[in-house]
């Protein structure tokens, strides 16, 4: 077996995480995998949470349930949808997908959704934000899971709105980045 040439180009050598041809189908597939993987995760979460949210309406709602629902939906649209996704997360996903397209490496292409989300090759601050954000979300999932209906469904309705906004923002910003 021979050693890999520059940037892992020798096909008889070991696989490397080096650069992949920029204009290649692999680079394009990697960028699509980045956005598609992130969007698939968001859509899956919306689907699961929407079912729980809809089930809340099987319970009788008092005025305070309606008040909570009417407060949580615009709050989550603003905080999660606009501030969290449209202004922070979605632009990063679009930008990093285009980085995969223009500067692909084997690692970036294979782990494209994780790269696009910022789990590696970002600044220390970005990575810490992603890891702490992920852990915070996991803690919230555990806590909300313990709530009884209709409260769980009310909170999940807000999350569904935020995640739906995030899905649309991620797709729209990615299409815009792809065209530029």
Predicted regions and their residues:
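Cytosolic-side membrane-entry/anchor segment at the start of a transmembrane helix
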Residues: 2-52, 163-180
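Juxtamembrane "helix-exit" motif on the non-cytosolic side of transmembrane helices
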Residues: 46-56, 81-86, 142-152
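Membrane-proximal soluble regions of multi-pass membrane proteins
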Residues: 81-123
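Alpha-helical transmembrane segments and their membrane-interface junctions
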Residues: 118-148
């Amino acid at each position: 077996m021979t050693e890999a040439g520059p940037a892992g180009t020798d096909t008889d050598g070991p696989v490397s995480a080096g650069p992949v041809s920029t204009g290649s189908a692999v680079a394009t597939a990697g960028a699509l995998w980045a956005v598609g993987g992130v969007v698939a995760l968001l859509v899956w979460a919306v689907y699961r949470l929407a079912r729980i949210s809809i089930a809340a309406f099987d319970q009788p709602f008092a005025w305070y349930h309606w008040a909570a629902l009417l407060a949580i939906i615009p709050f989550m649209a603003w905080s999660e949808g606009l501030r969290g996704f449209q202004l922070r997360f979605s632009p990063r996903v679009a930008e990093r997908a285009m980085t995969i397209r223009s500067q692909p490496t084997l690692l970036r292409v294979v782990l494209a959704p994780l790269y696009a989300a910022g789990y590696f090759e970002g600044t220390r601050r970005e990575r810490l934000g992603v890891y702490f954000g992920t852990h915070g979300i996991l803690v919230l999932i555990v806590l909300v899971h313990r709530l009884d209906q209709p409260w769980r469904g009310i909170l999940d309705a807000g999350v569904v709105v935020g995640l739906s906004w995030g899905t649309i923002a991620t797709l729209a910003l990615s299409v815009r980045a792809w065209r530029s």
